[in-house]
Amino acid sequence: LVHITLDVWQDKVYYLGKEYPAGYFAAGVLNVSHNLVVTITGEGGFLLDAYAIAKFGDREQLEELLPVLWESVENMLRSLRQVPPFSLWNMEAELGKMRVMLSKDHIDQLLDNPEEKMWFLAYLRAGILLPISIYHFVIAAWHLETYYLHRLGKRDETHFAVAFHDFYHDPSTKEVLEKMFAPTIEPFDANPRLRSSYTFARDPKDEKKMIFVNRVFFSSYMDFYVYDLLNGMHWGHAPSLCECCLKYFLTTDSHKPKYCDGMAPQNPHYTCRQYGAMNQQKEKNANHPIYRIFKTRTNTIRKHQERGKISEELRKAAIALCEEIAGQGPLRHRICSGGVPETDGAGGGVCGGPEASGR
């Protein structure tokens, strides 16, 4: 929790040994719920109140503080399991380490070992600042995506750079950032602070080759999220809101997809992309010339049956024939043109029969 390290190579980042597209974490954190932010911010506020006692308290004060401190840290860590990159952690192992650090058996080391005390206080500081970092970043990135990125016709580095420049220098953006809770603590900044070096790794595309990987160190999660956002846009990746599930996802090419690849909440058997495509096809079908004619002719058939001009059996047969032929139209791009051939003298015409489709 105290710091985070990210390996960067081309348009990929590597965290805990796994590969992700640049911008993955910045897009994912936008899906945190309001209730989760409230929860972790509340725990961060408690850690802030307890920090002075943790730093200057004597044995008796620490014995009283550590149990409630552990409860607060546990609540925060369990809540963070829904937030990337913490969702990728072995959270039970992290909880185990903190349970030991915040136990009464550890008090002697906190009082007698300066390095142990320094690490303990650094963890508390991270717990205080992390919720504010998430809150400030989410508000700023939401503003960026909603008012600047979402309207872009083309999603590439040039368009993202212009959009971010306009966003960052817009007076309304400054007003939004200044009105946030604790605006001077972990503010959204376009110049993330970081430290970097190089390391070596196997080429993901060819294990026989070695590559240089940029290893980036962050002491602030705000800097981590901002860097991932900007690095993603540098490679043409950016967050976008799915119009089906209303969650944010990362786009990685220049066209603007409306839907993500997650499961559609309306139907768990389909992804949002599949569900959206189905709805689009239905809308196209509803406006297709064949289906307008289909609706007109089936209404005519129904009225003829009601007026006694045709039998119920003939009505069913005619409707079935209309449905069969109309169902072939848009899917095969068979457009009905010209007149509508009559069937069986009953006045019920159908469109798109063999003669029409063979033109």
Region spans (language model):
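Cysteine-rich micro-motifs
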Residues: 254-275
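Short helix-coil boundary/hinge micro-motifs
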Residues: 1-250, 281, 285, 289-308, ...
